[in-house]
Amino acid sequence: ADTDDEGSVRGFSFITAPYEAEIGFATRLRDTAFKRVLRNLAPGAEVKLDAPYGDFRLHNNESRPAVFVIGGIGATPVRSIVAQATHDRTGHRILLLHANRSIDDAPFQADFLRFAEQNPNFRFVPVFTDAVPPLWKGESGRIAAATIRRWVPQLAEPIWYLSGPEGMVKAMRRLLVEMEIDEDDIRTEEFAGY
């Protein structure tokens, strides 16, 4: 098969939750040899999967809220986490601040809106940085300390999850540390190359 300098193996975050019947993942289909092969796979094609890795998952203590501050494709692992929490009816209070350039660039919007309808413990806050929809009354611009404080009055209470492009995740981590959030309460998932 066609390949590139990185070979034919990649790591992906699942978008599907354990209860869902199919396994799914998301990626941006750039014009690389690997992505061309991936794009041209026929439905039902056999692929080799390795065991799941990583620890970007919802914490066990339901008394502590979870706050996800994510950008763009960083929604990939969060979609599966929120789907499973909604399915299991966990007691976790979950807030998702999801930044995207525009509504057209925002992955899984319909899923997150559906989860918010189904799960009284889940709040979904879309944030648009560039193209704000007409008559939009929600959040816009970059996620800043003021944005976070509007939605999270008790900053030390939650476990914080940051997911998205590497630069965004690093900037959000710095911001949270500047806001005196304990680094032990911050979990991250960086998407290199986005």
Give the positions of each predicted feature.
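A short, basic/flexible loop-to-alpha-helix module at the beginning of a structural domain
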Residues: 51-62
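Histidine-anchored nucleotide/phosphate-binding helix
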Residues: 14, 75-87
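Short amphipathic alpha-helical segments
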Residues: 39, 61, 80-82, 109-110, ...
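Short helix-loop-beta connector
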Residues: 60-64, 155-156
